[in-house]
Amino acid sequence: MDLSIVKLLEEDEEVDSKHSEDDLQMFQDSLIRDIEGSNLKSINNTTGNESEKPQPRYMKLQKMSSKETPWVEKTVDPVNHNLRLARVTDLLRTVVDHQPGKKTHCLNLHYKLKRKELTMEEFMRQLRDLVGDQIIRSVISQLPQLKPGNMGIKVPGRSNHDKVSKSAEFTAQESDPREVHVNQLSSTTSGTLNSSTTVQGLNKHPEQHMQLPSSSFHMDTKSGSLNPYPGTNVTSPGSSSRAKLPDFQHRENNQNVGIASVGGPTKSTINMTTVPKFERPTFVNGPSRVQDGPISDFPKNSSFPLYSAPWQGSVTKDHTVGPSSSVIHVEHKLIDQSFEQAHKPRYLVQQGVTNVPLKQKNAIPISSNDDLEKQSSKMGLFTSTTSASSVFPSMTTQLDSSTMVNMPAPSETIPKIANVTVTPKMPSVGQKKPLEALGSSLPPSRKKQKICGTSSDESIEKFNDVTAVSGINLREEEKQLLDSGPKKNDRVSKAYRRLVHGEEERTLLQKIPLQRKLTEIMGKSGLKHIDHDVERCLSLCVEERMRGLLFNIIRISKQRTDAEKCRNRTFITSDIRKEINEMNQKVKEEWEKKHSGEEKNKENDTEKEDQRSNEVKANKKDEDKERAKAANVAVRAAVGGDDRFSKWKLMAEARQRSSPGPGRNSKKLSGGTQFGKNQGLPKVVRSISVKDVIAVVEKEPQMSRSTLLYRVYNRICSDV
């Protein structure tokens, strides 16, 4: 068969999957009558009445409740246009299998019938003209006959219950757009589940009860919604015609929807109040193929919520519960919408449905109020509803045995899901807070505080004392320093005195020539005696005078820029003596190289050994220095001194180590880096000449006309 026909027929299969045997027999009889041409008028009248004026189910239920009691039995007409469409698809399949060449004509007829452009009689007449009477009769005889299903709406007022076919539900679904249909999901591979959906009532309280199989009650805690019917198709009263929700694919990444496999039709009862006037009864269809999708999306298409009235009821605690069901008594109270959004967790439901964030496997009955409170505190049961008729003053949900919600609960469903936080009750305004609750005590006295402070300071000092850890006793060190102080001072003072005395005895001028000069001056001037201090004083004066002269000469030599030029410009072309000296020096160097090779090897060996020993000694010295530095740092930290000086020292040493090559060149480079002005200029070698001496002597008033200045002039002239 072609894929396009298969897709078309699969779309129509969503309308119905199984029907009763009576419906099939009636449809076959009507088809045979249409083919034979008998009783066409009667069939037209019946089908026209059913297709044009379908009576909605909720109107029938209201009529039943208004006449006698709300529990009167009422059957529903089984014939439906959707049933005919479903059977027509089966008929067209078999016809196309017999005659594949007439596929396009069959498709056109099917579209016209689906759009209600053709009636059933016209469709059958055109199909009979297209294919033939014999083929249509053989196809109708080959149509599969189905067993009667277990689905139906039952009323507990009588012993026998009528079986209502699926066609009646589809008529109600098509005729009344305000009804809410919840179709249970059933997998095609594992088969269908036959379960009975009954509308029951209690004798004391006229309430509606819906029995659902345990497999259809599922909790979705991630998406934040209670999904009692996984994969349902819901129509809301906001649409003018039959409003369908869009198909949702079963996505595991967005939400985790688990469908429990059920061996038998286990039941769970949900007690509800009577539906208000603006609401319509909810139908639960049997196991059929439905669309997948979260139930939490249906309020988008509706103008009011599905359950606007709070669930109430008065059921006694002696009510028996089956082994695969659990009884949870819940009293719902109104919670503000904003308060719910601010304080409720994500898995709570805001549409008035009890939310139990648990996977349901086995059942645990909970009958009493106290047991339920304990159980709910362990497993994190939260309930919330919205009320359309009354407003409760309290803002918290409470648990009561008046309302009973039966749902399958597992025996393993008491894990540690939610952490229940209990806020401590605050005392009243006039009540005094005990000291134990506040965790405080009376403040101690000042003396005790001082004692504790001193003891803590001592302990901290002992703990922070680095010298104690290193094994140094400061008190003993102080005693040793005090004891050895005066002795050391005496020794130092004696040595210092000796050095000063030796330096004082040393003079710039020698004694013998100075004494000769002094005797000559004494003879000329007529002096007889001179003290020894005069000689020392004269030598010191000469020294100071020479220091001043040299300082001035050096300063002037730095200021001088002109270079000395010889008066007689002579160019030396050849110097024979210099060439002979260079040749002799080369010969000596070659001879020294030959004879000094062996001596150098010996010296190298000795130098290597010396270098090794020096390196070992240097390493030891470095280690000793580092230990001493660490000890000094520890002592300074213990005493409380500042350690910046030692840090600067270490930084300077590190710079010296990183500098390339020790020596004068490195010092010059470091000096050049310090002064940016002279960094790029090469250093000029300075020298002192006679001109500098003359310039200094001429500026002095005492020496400007002295004989020394004339002598210097004469030397310059003689040298030139």
From Swiss-Prot:
The keyword Oxidoreductase does not apply. The keyword DNA repair does not apply. Belongs to the TAF4 family. Gene3D superfamilies: Histone, subunit A. Pfam families: RST, TAF4. CDD domains: HFD_TAF4 (cd08045). This is Transcription initiation factor TFIID subunit 4. TAFs are components of the transcription factor IID (TFIID) complex that is essential for mediating regulation of RNA polymerase transcription. Keywords: Activator, Nucleus, Transcription, Transcription regulation. Component of the TFIID complex. TFIID is composed of TATA binding protein (TBP) and a number of TBP-associated factors (TAFs) whose MWs range from 14-217 kDa. Interacts with TAF5, TAF10, TAF12, TAF12B, TAF15 and TAF15B. One of its GO terms (cellular component) is transcription factor TFIID complex. One of its GO terms (biological process) is DNA-templated transcription initiation. It is found in: Nucleus.
